[in-house]
Amino acid sequence: MPDDPSPSRRRFLGDAFALGASSLILPRAFGAVREPSGATVLESDDAHIAIAALDPPSRVFVDHEGTGLKEARRASAARFTSAQGVVELAPEGAGIGVKVTCPNGPLTRVVLRWTTTYSPMSLFLGDAWERGYGDLQWRFLQPERVMPWYFAAHDPSSGRTVMYGVMTQPAAMCFWTVDATGTSLWLDFRNGGGPSRPGNREIAAATIVSMTTRPLTPLAALSRFCRLLSLNPRVASAPICGNNNWYYAYGKNFDADAMRRDATFLAEISAGHANRPYCVIDAGWTPGSSAPGGPWTKGDVAKFPDMPALAADMKRIGVRPGIWIRPTALTVVDDPKRLRRGPAHDEEKPLDLTLPENLELIRSDIARMRAWGYELIKHDFSTYDAFGRWGFDMGAELTEGKWSWADQSLTNAEVILRLYATLREGAGDGVLLGCNTIGHLAAGSFEIQRAGDDTSGRAWERTRRMGINTLAYRLPQHGAFFQIDPDCAAHTASTPWELDRQFLDLIAKSGTALFVSVDPRTVTPEQKSAYREAMMTALSGGARGGAEPLDWLHTTAPREWRIGGRRVTYQWEEAWGALPFRV
């Protein structure tokens, strides 16, 4: 961001960066040198990367009651005060830490504002609150656009990419907006749909970092920035791959024998590879709807009478057992006091995630599945259960107003962080796959994250819209936050094999997590050969050199890819083109 003429601000920044530069974890190929500006420049054979500390914001605004923003008074270069609180900026690692105290009242939002300008040719990309919904894209300047957690501004004419973000696991829900005169970071401290009441404690709200690169491609730039944002990811020891029965069963008409059949198919298409894949039992192994809640003490008595025995059978077949759970809601409610207030739209009732007894229930449910022998636990629906909205509808509001958790001292981000820590504790050394989870809060707790909304075994258009988009636009997070799961490469009689086959090929070669979803009874010899080739590639980490979308600046479903140094064109469209209807 532009230099500020104030000597005190410049001194503050220089000191901040001097303290933070040594803590960076960077590729060995780079060497660091100090420029007179105070930025650190990382030189390699092909890139110039500057990790520059931001200037303090020119203005700070606070909303305590949820009634509107009011400008805070600048007490010093790094301290801003309101009637009931204090916002302080301090050096923290490679960036600037934002700390907030509000001992005597409520706290809703804080907005940090910088005066900035960007090249008129710039295209902007932000992240999403949870999964992508086919809506991730580089876009022209749109002042009201909510860009959660981080954003990039890329100038195609110069090849320069400027990126700003907050480090993973912040204590506030954070998003950015950019307009013609400035850049704003919005920090949401609410509890449920109303203000939090943090009391006499300091909230370490976020750490802000920035990076500028040239002439790296936008993907390479964002990939390096994501590694800077997440210094302590939970890294699996090998690529995570397997199969999942959801897109041919959809939670109905399957049993333990069907899962043994799935396990046998997976063992066959991965035979000979040392990295053993996971066979995941998706929703439907307990009574209830297609997305049931707890209790999670046993399987459906008729269809899944012995869950530990099924896990043992899968291991004997030669695969690793995995299982699905919705840990944050109940189908059978033993005590209404367990439930949170606020929006609840399903028969499954959401738990209040601030109650200790509910966190203990969640921990024990996850631990029980590990004790049964399941090595990968796919947990689902927690963001929807927490806020009553899907990611595409969260926007700046996140949830409906006028409700709160039982413990109002916590921010929503802190509530979710505690949930993820509880899931991690229950899973022990097992693999956690988060679905409908908040990636920026999950990094460091989960090995793998579902990055987009569901693909489909019913309509190819859904796979085209969701799967390809999320693979391309969440690829920078792969290996930086966790392993990326772009969702299943599915195939049924309702979807065209030639298009499904291409998606299968792209996932396998990209190095992201490949999960296939197909009924083994329907697979032809040609298809089985394709599944085996893809699975063996994916288990080995994808194509050498990885995959990069080449046309993603101009489309939401990239067709042109560089894979292993070779340019590949995929054909995603059906005969009539893309379907413009809701899927």
For each predicted feature, which ranges?
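N-terminal export signals
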Residues: 4, 11-32
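C-terminal segment of N-terminal export signals and the immediately downstream linker at the start
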Residues: 26-48
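Carbohydrate-recognition beta-sandwich/jelly-roll modules
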Residues: 40-277, 376
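Short alpha-helical segments and helix-capping/turn motifs at coil-helix boundaries
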Residues: 96, 227-228, 264-266, 306-310, ...
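Hydrophobic, Leu/Ile/Phe/Ala-enriched alpha-helical segments that form helix-helix packing faces
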Residues: 102-104, 153-157, 263-270, 314, ...
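Active-site-proximal substrate-binding groove within the catalytic cores of carbohydrate-active enzymes
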Residues: 199-201, 244, 408-583
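Aromatic- and carboxylate-enriched substrate-binding clefts and catalytic-loop regions
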Residues: 275-491, 527
